[in-house]
C-alpha cells in the first residue's frame, strides 16, 4: 500500500507539469487567435515587426499586439507592411493605429498624386512607384513603364507601408535595414520612410536608364533606311514618358518639405539622407525632361525625312513627265495633216525622226539623273 502511494505521489508532479504545458500551449494559441480576430480573412499583411533600439524583436506579431509591445518601450516602433489591403482590413488597422479616414480612403483606392499630408500626429506620404517592362520591340500597344502606388503612414511609434502594384517590393529594403543598416533604424519610423522613398527613387533612375536605351534604338531606326516607320513607336514612347513624368515630377514638393530645415518633420540625421534622395529625384526629373525634348527632335527629324521623301517622289514624277512630253509632242506633230512634209519624201526621214527622239530622251534622262531627280 505504501509503495502504491509513493508511486502515485511521484506521478502527480509529472501530471501537473504536463497539464501546465498544455495550458500554456492552448493559451498561446487562443491569444494568437484573439489578437488576429480584428482582421478579416485573407489578410494583406506582408510583414509586421517590432524594433527596439534599431533591432528587430524575434517572433511573429499581429498589428495590435505589435503596437502594444512598442508602446511599452521608449525606443521602439512597429513596421507594418501591407499589400493591396481591402477597405474592411484597412479600417480595422486604422482603428488600432488611429489613422484618419481620409488617409485610409486614399490608401485603399490608390489613385493619388504624390503628396505629403499631416493628420494630427500621423504623417501620410504618397509615392508613385515605377517599373520598366521589358519588350522585344516598341509598338503602339507596348507597355514600357508600369506604375503603382506606395503609401507610408508615419507615427510616433509606428510606420505603415501600403503597396499597390508589383513595383517596388519592400522585402529587400527591410532586409537591408535589418542586416546592414541597423544603426539607421535607431532613428525611428522616419528611417523606414527614408528607406522606402530611396528605393522608389532608385527604381526611377533604373527606369530612366532603360528608357534612354529605347530612345537610342528609336533614334537609330529613324536614320536607318532599312527600318520601317518609327512614328508609332515615337508616339507610344511619348505616352509612356508622360505616365512616368506623372510619377516623378509631383514628388519634388513632398521631398522638398521633408528635407527642409524649417519643417522640422524629421530628425536631423535622417534629413541628410532625404536630401540625398532629393538630389537623385532632381536628376531623374532632368533626365525625363531631356528625353521629352529628344523625342520631339526625333519626331521633327522623321517628319522632315517624310517631307524630303515626298519631294523626291514629286521630282521623279516631274522628270518622267518631262521625258514623256517629248514623245507626246512628237506624236502630235507627226499626226497633223500638213500638205507638204519634206521629211516624208526623204529616205532617212523616218529613222532620223526616231534617232532624234531617242537622242533627246537620253539627254534629258542624263540631265535629270545628274541633278538627282532620277
Regions flagged by a language model, labelled:
Residues 2-16, 279-374:
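Hydrophobic alpha-helical transmembrane segments and their immediately adjacent juxtamembrane loops
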Residues 259-271, 295-306:
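Long amphipathic alpha-helical coiled-coil segments
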Residues 1-267, 273-276, 280-290, 373-374:
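Peripheral, non-transmembrane regulatory/ligand-interaction domains of membrane transport proteins
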